[in-house]
């Protein structure tokens, strides 16, 4: 593939490893040609265009308008006709209404910035309930945080780090998330409810203990004053 990259657009600097990274993402997506794919934080459409020939349709979303213009050009120069791109803040573009209008994704590929995904974006993804999510991250810490937020509904199917920046502590990490069965989801939600209830009870007991201690101290002080 050929790519046009403008001065305001993001592109992986290590092109050889970038190819390996995109191959891993495509492998994890396990496309058959029938899927509607959402590519979140698409940048110049590199992953979107890379997987397009394996999908029925790919929708890319990116915050930077100039990058989206590059993404459209990149589809054109590579004769790719099954992509659509939208520019705007992810939490404002990716909504339940957007999915109703454009179709429920079979697969979501997400490659957010170091800060990870906004909670509203995660909730919309959970509402959409795709069969698979491929999460590409340059920050394993925020990736782990986001995976925890999706743990009730998705399980980790595979993990593959890619050394994009040799001789540095930085790494790109690709995680495949697979939708849990209905029975598994029900059990996970039950366990979470029990944990939350236990935490609430422990907090209430601690507050009651503190109150009783304060009342006892006040009573002792009153007795001292009476003496």
Residue positions per predicted region:
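Rossmann-like S-adenosyl-L-methionine
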Residues: 1-226
